[in-house]
Amino acid sequence: EETDGMERRSAQTALWLILDTMTKLFAPILAFTCDEIWQAMPHRGEEDGRNVILNEMNQPFADYALSPAEMEKWALVEDLRDDVNVVLENARNEKKIGKALEAHVVLYPQGDEGKQAMEKLSGFTTDQLADLFIVSDVEIAQGTGAAGVKVPGIQAAVSEAKGEKCERCWKHHIKVGADKEHPTLCPRCARVIRTIEL
């Protein structure tokens, strides 16, 4: 993503919070290793940068707590990802695809259960679902596919993704090569590279 892009900054923040917490947790056991990590990482203003042992253990981050509705939505995403992974594995076994990033996934909502599940997923774009499933493309359509085990209201099917492979993100996209400055990149990666080059 862009250097100051929200997704990139969010991922960096999450990774930093995990590193900060794990370094403090392991410090009594791996004192020298954790101290070396502590010396190399950035710190919050209230933390003592001299040694990891001189700092309080992190408390749960209330700012990042999810509401029950958000927890339910993410549980649904995890269950749906598990169902999609089963369909991907079957497609691999049938030699339809090699790797997950070569896949185009179609989700077929079925009946009221499917409609309710799709309403919970309405905050996600198909590009975000593709990122969560680690596939090239996701489409939502009418029809039938393999029945889900964990999310019975949504069926899924897999086919080979159309287009060329982007050499940066490895996703297959029909518009790889559309950007003359970056002929081997998909539009998203070409946009990101342009912002980095400025």
Tell me the role of every PLM-derived stretch.
Residues 124-140:
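A glycine-rich helix N-cap at a beta->alpha junction
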Residues 166, 186-189:
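Short cysteine-rich clusters marking metal-coordination/redox-active sites
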Residues 192-198:
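Short metal-binding segments enriched for Cys and/or His
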Residues 110-126:
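Short glycine/threonine-rich loop-to-helix capping motif typified by GTGT followed
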Residues 1-87, 91-113, 139-141, 146-156, ...:
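Acidic, turn-prone loop/beta-hairpin segments
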Residues 175-184:
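Short linker/helix segments within small regulatory modules
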Residues 161-164, 181:
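Flanking scaffold residues of small Cys/His-coordinated metal-binding clusters
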Residues 27, 170-173, 190:
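Cys/His-coordinated zinc-binding microdomains
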